[in-house]
Regions:
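N-terminal carbohydrate-binding accessory modules
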Residues: 37-94, 98-103
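Substrate-binding cleft/loops of secretory-pathway carbohydrate-active enzymes
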Residues: 220-229
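Sec-dependent signal peptide cleavage junction
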Residues: 23-39
Length: 229
């Protein structure tokens, strides 16, 4: 069976995730550090390029998944430099990674994984159940995420309700993430985007889960009104 573990796109979270969950900080304060830029922690030699075809071929920059190290609780980038403030190491996964060897993930000193539930309301990730089941069997704690395609609070609420229904029966020990990066949503006002995020997070919180908003620094600076969250 082909294993695509080495293709997994990793995201590394700054700060103490467990502590943030325990004190239940407002969603706007958790992992919304404007001074943290993913690019600042990546050495140039860590980047690799991959071809992506959909009629025409284009290349996109990816991070070599073998580049980061965690040694004795300290995180290092590919140049061997300590990443300030980073104390935990994880990844997100979806059907794009294919079949994942979760035992290998566990052996690779991965502290957690976020598993995609869906792409909006139109596409439920077909590897979600397999990933949630096998991650738990391998002893890898999981959170979940929804790649939002919402353009209104009504749709954001439905995305949250879908997430809640899909998590039934699974052990979700890390946050439920609202992934804001869709190009269509970037055309909305910051107020509307923030209201969508708040709607999603409130519904998830009411169901007993801990919500979190994921976005890149561009979205953080330009498309979200954090005073509303």
């Amino acid at each position: 069976m082909k294993r695509d573990f080495l293709k997994i796109r990793k995201r590394f979270i700054v700060g103490c995730l467990a502590a943030a969950i325990a004190v239940a900080q407002p969603v706007s304060s958790v992992f919304a550090n404007p001074h943290y830029d993913r690019r600042d922690t990546v050495a140039e030699e860590e980047f690799i390029y991959s071809a992506r075809t959909s009629g025409t071929e284009s290349s996109r920059k990816k991070v070599n998944p073998k580049a980061w190290k965690k040694i004795n609780g300290v995180c290092y980038n590919g140049s061997g430099k300590i990443i300030p403030g980073a104390i935990t190491r994880g990844m997100d996964v979806s059907e794009w990674q294919g079949n994942i060897d979760w035992k290998q993930v566990k052996r690779s000193d991965i502290d957690f994984a976020f598993v995609r539930i869906s792409y909006g309301l139109t596409h439920e990730d077909y590897t979600y159940d397999e990933n949630m089941t096998n991650a738990e069997l391998a002893g890898v704690p999981t959170g979940t995420y929804v790649y939002s395609t919402a353009l209104s609070t009504t749709t954001a609420l439905k995305e949250a309700q879908l997430a809640i229904s899909k998590m039934q029966g699974y052990k979700v020990s890390y946050p439920v993430v609202y992934d804001l990066e869709d190009a269509k949503a970037s055309k909305l006002s910051a107020k509307t985007v923030s209201e969508m995020a708040l709607t999603f997070c409130n519904e998830v919180r009411r169901a007993g889960y801990y919500p979190m908003v994921y976005c890149n620094t561009n979205w953080y600076d330009n498309y979200i009104d954090w005073s509303l969250l």
